[in-house]
Amino acid sequence: MKRLIALLLVVLIAVSLYGCAGEKSKGPEPGTPLNTFYQAIMDAQPENAEELILFEESNPDLIASFYPGLDSIELSQQAFYMPPIATHPCEIVLVEVKNDADVQKVADIFQARIDMGADNTNYPESAAGWQLYAQVQKSGNFVCMIVLPEGYVIPENVFEV
């Protein structure tokens, strides 16, 4: 009888612990507005930091010049935030791809943009910013390329709002 009670207690504890494990995050829901992530990035900045000035860019020729190959990938949504001065290392690009097989392709395109900025020998200070403060993040069908100036915060997971 004691063994049966002990066994039942072990099973009960195991079931309780399994219930406490929680559900792993699968990433953002498809169709989550990209502005949600952009605003979360802006809200994460230190209070004493100067306000970041970025403009939403929609010119397809300009976008294609910075992100060659991106125009051949089917996107559900896209948002490009660029600084007023093109050589300033401060960009936030957020996309949601329609086909999950394209996530890595987009990440590679974004990494190529980072590499291009980091290799800019005409503006060594700008290149240093791209080398030190730029990254690509992925979650589900969402991909982000972000570079912010020194002293600003890139969230560990841009897509965790």
Residue ranges and their predicted role:
Residues V11-L12:
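Repetitive helical segments and hydrophobic/amphipathic motifs
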Residues M1-L8:
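Positively charged n-region of N-terminal signal peptides that target proteins for export
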Residues C20-E91, V97-V161:
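Soluble, non-membrane globular domain cores that form compact, hydrophobic packing
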Residues V15-G19:
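C-terminal motif of bacterial Sec signal peptides marking the signal peptidase cleavage site
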